[in-house]
Amino acid sequence: VVLVPELDVRALEASLHFYAEVLEFRILFERSAERFAYLEHDGVELMLQEAAGPGRRFRTAPLESPYGRGVNFQLCVADVDAVHTRTVSSGAKIVVPIEERWYPIDVAVSAGRWQVTGPTEVGNRQFVLADPDGYLWRPFRDLGIRPADDSA
């Protein structure tokens, strides 16, 4: 199973510049007549469609800015600090400053790297930024799993 989000954007060129320069996505292909692009970054695939362009639409309500309310996209990267530096240099809006954050895991899990039997935390070095249309992205580096800190 592969999940490939398609995001409506106001200006395809501005969005392509942002995704290529800040988040290092590469353009796999474009359908210029439809104002559409298909992007990829280390196995993560993403589609962009210009909202006012002639392409096909899947909407349940009028589109209002900022787009993407109620969702953020978490993107695992090798060097979150480099992504943060590019974000600052680009002038993109940083919503949550870079941080190390540990999240509690309340239940036992046994799947893949998640071998959790007691009170545990999973950590990220992360920040949240907004793309030109207001979609929120959370680049992060996985800090691993540790026993929960009972002093918190």
Q: Which positions does each model-derived feature cover?
A:
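Conserved active-site tyrosine of GNAT-family acetyltransferases
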Residues: S15, Y19-A20, T87, D131-G134
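Vicinal oxygen chelate
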Residues: V1-E6, R26-A130, F140-A152
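Conserved beta-strand-loop-alpha-helix junction that forms the acyl-donor binding cleft
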Residues: V9-A11
